[in-house]
Amino acid sequence: MDSPWDELALAFSRTSMFPFFDIAHYLVSVMAVKRQPGAAALAWKNPISSWFTAMLHCFGGGILSCLLLAEPPLKFLANHTNILLASSIWYITFFCPHDLVSQGYSYLPVQLLASGMKEVTRTWKIVGGVTHANSYYKNGWIVMIAIGWARGAGGTIITNFERLVKGDWKPEGDEWLKMSYPAKVTLLGSVIFTFQHTQHLAISKHNLMFLYTIFIVATKITMMTTQTSTMTFAPFEDTLSWMLFGWQQPFSSCEKKSEAKSPSNGVGSLASKPVDVASDNVKKKHTKKNE
C-alpha cells in the first residue's frame, strides 16, 4: 500500500493544466507584455503586432523546442483551443472597459496565485520537453536537457527575436549572455529530470515533480513578497566556478604582478638616464671653467 505522500504526489502529477493553470500562464505572460513601455498604445494602433508578441510570450517555449528538433515552428497553432484561450486573455487584458483586468491583477494575492500556478506549468513543460526529446534521441541526455530547458524557459529567449524585429533589441538584454532566474531554475530542473529519466536518480518521476514544483513555487512567492527581482544562485555558482576554474587564478595573479613590476622598472631606468646625462654636463662645464 502506497503512503499518503506517494498518493498525493501521484495525484498531483496527474493534474491537468487545462484550463485553469493554462489561463494563469497566459495571464502572467500577457501582463508582462502589457507592462512594457508603449505596449498599450501599440495594441490600439497595431493589434496584430501586439497579438503576435503576446503569442510569442505564451508559446515561445514550444516554438523554440520545435526549431531545435527541426519541427514546424507553427505547430503550436494546431491547438486551436489554447490559441483561442490565449487570444481571449490578450483581448480582455488590453481592451477590457475601464482596464478592469489590470486593476484586478494589481492586487498582490491575485499576482501570487497566478504566478504560482504559472510555475506549476513550468514543471509540466520541462517534463514534456525531456520526454519529447527522448522520443527522437534515445537517452541523448544533452538533447533532452536542451529541449527541456527550451520548453520551460523558451518564452524569455524567443522574445529576443521579437525585440529584434521591433528594433528594441539590446545586447546587454540577451538571455543567452545574461541568464535570468527563470532560465537558471529551468535549466536546473531540466538537468534533474533528465537524470531521473535516464535512471541516474533513484527517485520516482511523480515525487520529483512534486518536490521541484514546491521549490519553484516557494521561491517565486518569496521573491514577490520580499520584492526582490532575483533569487541568486551566486553561492553555488561561485563554488562551482572555484572548483572548476580556481586553479587559473594563481597564474593570472602572478602574471598581473609581473606586468605591474615591468613598467615601474622601465620608468626608473628612463628617469635615471637624464640624471646621469645632467651630471656629466655639469662636470664638463666645471672642467672648462677651471681650464
From Swiss-Prot:
Residues the entry annotates as binding a 1,2-diacyl-sn-glycero-3-phospho-(1D-myo-inositol-4,5-bisphosphate): K118, R122
Gene Ontology biological-process annotations: bone development; bone mineralization; cellular response to caffeine; endoplasmic reticulum organization; establishment of localization in cell; extracellular matrix constituent secretion; lung alveolus development; lung epithelial cell differentiation
Activity control, per UniProt: Channel activity is activated by increased cytosolic Ca(2+) levels and blocked by luminal high Ca(2+) levels.
Cytoplasmic side of membrane: 34-50, 100-104, 157-179, 228-291
Coiled coil, from the record: none
Cysteines paired by S-S bonds: none
Key word Translocase present: no
Any Pfam family: TRIC
Lumenal side: 1-19, 71-82, 122-139, 196-207
Keywords from the named record: Endoplasmic reticulum, Ion channel, Ion transport, Membrane, Osteogenesis imperfecta, Phosphoprotein, Potassium, Potassium channel, Potassium transport, Transmembrane, Transmembrane helix, Transport
Any one GO MF annotation of this record: potassium channel activity
Regions that span the bilayer: 20-33, 51-70, 83-99, 105-121, 140-156, 180-195, 208-227
Family designation: Belongs to the TMEM38 family.
Associated disorder: Osteogenesis imperfecta 14: An autosomal recessive form of osteogenesis imperfecta, a disorder of bone formation characterized by low bone mass, bone fragility and susceptibility to fractures after minimal trauma. Disease severity ranges from very mild forms without fractures to intrauterine fractures and perinatal lethality. Extraskeletal manifestations, which affect a variable number of patients, are dentinogenesis imperfecta, hearing loss, and blue sclerae. OI14 is characterized by variable degrees of severity of multiple fractures and osteopenia, with normal teeth, sclerae, and hearing.
Protein name as it appears in the record: Trimeric intracellular cation channel type B
Source species: Homo sapiens (Human)
Lineage of origin: Eukaryota, Metazoa, Chordata, Craniata, Vertebrata
Gene of this entry: TMEM38B
